[in-house]
Regions:
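Short glycine-enriched loop/turn motifs at secondary-structure junctions
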Residues: 21-22, 47, 102, 167-171
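Conserved core of the sugar-phosphate nucleotidyltransferase
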Residues: 109-178
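Conserved N-terminal catalytic core of the sugar/cofactor nucleotidyltransferase
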Residues: 1-5, 33-104, 108-119, 123
Length: 179
C-alpha cells in the first residue's frame, strides 16, 4: 500500500531508564538491528515515505543510526507524547492527509498492522485512531479506559491507575493515526 499522503512521526527522544544502559534504548539491537531502525523501516514498508524522528536524549546516537534519509525534530525536555509530536509541527504545515505517530521502541510492529490502522482511520473517518493490545499482564503499560458503549474515554498511565484500572488488560500500544 502506498501512503504518499501520510507523514510518520517516530518518537525517539526517550531515556529508557528501565533498561539501565549508558546508551539510548533506541540504539539497542534486536537480531543485529537497532530498535529505532526497525520501527522506521516498518513504517517505510507500510508505504510511508515522509518520516520525522523526534529525538532528544542521546540524539546523536539515534541520528547516526537513522541517517540522513529522514527529517528530525528536537525535544530537549521530555514532556510526554503530545509534546514530542508538537516538536514536529513545522513538518505538518500545509500537509494534507494523515499523521501516523509511533513510538521508536516498537521494533516488532508489522507493516501490515500499520496499514490496517491507517485503513481503519480513513474508512471510519476518524480524527484519531489508536492501536491497542490485550495483555494478560499489563503491568507497566498505559490502560485503555472505555465507556459502556465501548468508546475510548482515556488512557491512564500505570503510575496513575487506581485499583480498578489496574485490572484493565487493554493497553496503549503507542501507535496512533490522526487526520
Amino acid at each position: 500500500m502506498e501512503n504518499d499522503d501520510i507523514i510518520a512521526i517516530v518518537m525517539a527522544a526517550g531515556k529508557g531508564t528501565r533498561m539501565k544502559s549508558k546508551n539510548s534504548k533506541l540504539v539497542q539491537k534486536i537480531y543485529g538491528k537497532e530498535i529505532v531502525k526497525r520501527a522506521v523501516e516498518n513504517a517505510q514498508k507500510a508505504g510511508v515515505k515522509d518520516i520525522v524522528a523526534v529525538v532528544g536524549y542521546k540524539k546523536e546516537e539515534v541520528m547516526k543510526v537513522l541517517g540522513e534519509d529522514i527529517k528530525y525534530a528536537f525535544q530537549d525536555e521530555m514532556l510526554g507524547t503530545g509534546h514530542a509530536v508538537m516538536q514536529a509541527k513545522e513538518y505538518l504545515k500545509g500537509k494534507k492527509g494523515r499523521v501516523l505517530v509511533l513510538n521508536g521502541d516498537v521494533p516488532l510492529i508489522r507493516p501490515e498492522t500499520l496499514n490496517k490502522l491507517i485503513e481503519k482511520s480513513i474508512e471510519n473517518k476518524e480524527y484519531a485512531t489508536l492501536l491497542t493490545a490485550i495483555y494478560d499482564d499489563p503491568t507497566g503499560y498505559g490502560r485503555i479506559v472505555r465507556d459502556e458503549g465501548g468508546n475510548i474515554e482515556g488512557i491512564v498511565e500505570e503510575k496513575d491507575t487506581n485499583e480498578e484500572q489496574k485490572k484493565i488488560t487493554e493497553i496503549n500500544a503507542g501507535i496512533y493515526c490522526f487526520d
